[in-house]
């Protein structure tokens, strides 16, 4: 499943699926989705990709943890509805305004974890902490990913457009 196109609302997202690990017993596998985001507060819907991974896994009972290793992103489950996404964008801007002062961005004060090419993104780190979700885990029962009727799996970009990764792990409980 390489260079897939996944429809994300009005956007189309290209991603590459990379197999990282498969156990000898075929009871678990770890995959990484590599993709580029396009904007701040972008919601990337990976539900169909995860459903396809589960279907191809042939796991009857297990779980699927999803994880982002980025501190300025989130993985959430919610409804794919334009009004909700617009409401989220408005409220997160009210709670953590882009134009506020963030000590994280003050190079005269900050002395830790600094890089020359670092983004001015204190607000993105605060937003990620408020959302507080770098991962979710869903059950697989009778070879079916258990997810609510209106629920979708979203990767949320809280910083600027950039290359990102989402790890998907399939675990067999049998």
What function would you assign to each model-found segment?
Residues 2-174:
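Active-site histidine-anchored catalytic micro-motif
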